Amino acid sequence: LLPVLVLSILIYKILHKNWRHSHWEVDIIAEKTGTLHFVEVKTRRTKKFGHPEENVNKKKIQNLINAADEYLYQQPQWKKIQFNILSITILKNKPIEYFFIEDVYL
């Protein structure tokens, strides 16, 4: 729910949450100003293992691309797309931190 709230504040229209096809998944598919956004969300409750966005590895990126390809096959009307990462850190007794990386080059 928190990722949807963050994106809503940033004026994104949420189209799908946890969209799946076969074994691929996109955490959030959203639209903003005519562009379709595929958003990978990473959340952590500790900084022990680094920042959440650092856990978006090559395999995850490839799965996101494959899922996006399938989505676009099913919804061919979209001409402009973008990949984003939403990183959320929730630490005890601290304000929630989020870091939104737009237009990630894959």
Predicted features, each with a name:
Residues L1-K17:
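Acidic-basic catalytic patches of nuclease active cores, encompassing PD-(D/E)XK
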Residues K13, L36, K80:
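Hydrophobic "anchor" residues on beta-strands that sit immediately upstream
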Residues H21-W24, K94:
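Short acidic/glycine-enriched loop/turn segments that link adjacent beta-strands
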Residues Y73-L106:
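Domain-level recognition of nuclease-like catalytic cores that cleave nucleotide substrates
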Residues W24, T35-H37, N84, F99:
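Protein kinase-like catalytic core scaffold
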Residues H16-R20, L86-T89:
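Short, solvent-exposed loop/turn elements at beta->coil junctions and helix N-caps
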Residues V26-K47, V56, L64:
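Conserved catalytic cores of phosphodiester-cleaving nucleases, focusing on short active-site segments
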Residues K48-K79:
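Mid-chain, well-packed structural core segment of small domains
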